[in-house]
Amino acid sequence: MTKSVIRTAVFPVAGRGTRFLPATKASPKEMLPVVDKPLIQYAVEEALMAGARRLVFVTGASKRAIEDHFDSDAELEKLLESQGKSELAAQVRSVLPKYATCIYIRQPAPLGLGHAVLCAQPAVGDEPFMVHLADDLIDAGVPCLKQMAAVYHQKGGSVLGVEEVPPSETDKYGIVETRGASTKISRIHGIVEKPKPAVAPSNLAVVGRYVLTPRIFSHLEKIGQGAGGEIQLTDGIARLMREQAVYAYRFEGKRFDCGSKLGYLQATVEYALNHSTLGGPFRNYLLDLMAAGQAPTASTGAASSPAAAPRPRRKRKA
């Protein structure tokens, strides 16, 4: 198999984000901020650092804010410069580097992740490509997709980012089956979408990162609706495995499930602790709360238990 340069990243962003209502009623869930950047910007930055230059967003209704975010805003930049806020103006300009191109494709119906990836085919063409699910925020020294691109170039086949999950949670993920000793890179021999714990082939879950060969498109075109009445990417990958090797890669880094409210809050706290300017004051705030033996009380009157002591982490740039 010819190992081409991976120039394209696909971002399926058509989902409605109902778990975050009413916050996502008029704003895309991918625009939810983690400290001072939206989830989709973290996703794009990871793809760019992995070598992507063409960014394909598969969108749906109420997603215009994503397009606006990555568009230039000369008026805002001019205003910031006139107010002496040159650093902020530079941050606005750097949201999307000039070498990157954005393509927006509308998913006509909510038919699942496999269908969303298939919608990107005209923009991807006959090249390998990355798929990034912005819900899964991964904090890593080397960006997760960059790690996976290296595995693709080493092995020459599609690569799925995986991690072990509690056996009781296999019905939330696509689960892979590998054979032999547990290693960082393993050939996949089976994959199933959201199996019940009693029948799951393992607890090794696919978590929002893919490097795929273009052959996946021909298989997605042939499959019907699977679990949940959707066209499942896992079903397409299962067919792809009949003709090409597909690999599971246990990535280095910590994943936050920002598709859940708890995971989103955990990401916000840890990224805030690691922020170059906010980290110190925020850490002191949490320590003061713990010293007082209480956590802040929400407006509903419900109080949470004292926070666990935050662990030191590498500093993140502002």
What do the predicted segments below correspond to?
Residues 2-82, 143-147:
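N-terminal glycine-rich phosphate-binding loop and ensuing alpha1 helix
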Residues 8, 53-55, 101, 128, ...:
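Residues at the starts of beta-strands that form the adenosine-phosphate
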Residues 15, 61, 136, 143, ...:
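Alpha-helix/helix-capping structural signal
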Residues 76-79, 86-178, 212-214, 221-223:
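Conserved beta-loop-beta/alpha segment of the NTase-like Rossmann-fold superfamily
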Residues 130, 149-153, 180-284:
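Catalytic-core segments of class I nucleotidyltransferases/pyrophosphorylases
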Residues 262-318:
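Hydrophobic helical membrane-anchoring modules
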